[in-house]
């Protein structure tokens, strides 16, 4: 499941408990990420799911749900 994989990657990258991560969680407001964290997260997700997220798309991503929906729309899963 995409959400589970995304959640694990976010927890690992940000050093937080995966149980804190919800679909509606904001990277900055809820999970305490900064802009560098988000760039590193996008890179890790691109590698894990073998996708490429253009910068203009990455700038629109603000929540976990945004990332999950983008990945689902751009993968075969």
Swiss-Prot record:
<dbReference type="InterPro" id="IPR006162">
    <property type="entry name" value="Ppantetheine_attach_site"/>
</dbReference>
<dbReference type="Pfam" id="PF00550">
    <property type="entry name" value="PP-binding"/>
</dbReference>
<keyword id="KW-0596">Phosphopantetheine</keyword>
<protein>
    <recommendedName>
        <fullName>Acyl carrier protein</fullName>
    </recommendedName>
</protein>
<dbReference type="GO" id="GO:0016020">
    <property type="term" value="C:membrane"/>
</dbReference>
<comment type="similarity">
    <text>Belongs to the acyl carrier protein (ACP) family.</text>
</comment>
<keyword id="KW-0275">Fatty acid biosynthesis</keyword>
<feature type="domain" description="Carrier">
    <location>
        <begin position="1"/>
        <end position="75"/>
    </location>
</feature>
<dbReference type="InterPro" id="IPR036736">
    <property type="entry name" value="ACP-like_sf"/>
</dbReference>
<comment type="pathway">
    <text>Lipid metabolism; fatty acid biosynthesis.</text>
</comment>
<dbReference type="GO" id="GO:0005829">
    <property type="term" value="C:cytosol"/>
</dbReference>
<keyword id="KW-0276">Fatty acid metabolism</keyword>
<comment type="function">
    <text>Carrier of the growing fatty acid chain in fatty acid biosynthesis.</text>
</comment>
<keyword id="KW-0963">Cytoplasm</keyword>
<keyword id="KW-0444">Lipid biosynthesis</keyword>
<keyword id="KW-0597">Phosphoprotein</keyword>
<feature type="modified residue" description="O-(pantetheine 4'-phosphoryl)serine">
    <location>
        <position position="35"/>
    </location>
</feature>
<dbReference type="InterPro" id="IPR009081">
    <property type="entry name" value="PP-bd_ACP"/>
</dbReference>
<dbReference type="GO" id="GO:0000036">
    <property type="term" value="F:acyl carrier activity"/>
</dbReference>
<dbReference type="GO" id="GO:0000035">
    <property type="term" value="F:acyl binding"/>
</dbReference>
<dbReference type="InterPro" id="IPR003231">
    <property type="entry name" value="ACP"/>
</dbReference>
<keyword id="KW-0443">Lipid metabolism</keyword>
<dbReference type="GO" id="GO:0009245">
    <property type="term" value="P:lipid A biosynthetic process"/>
</dbReference>
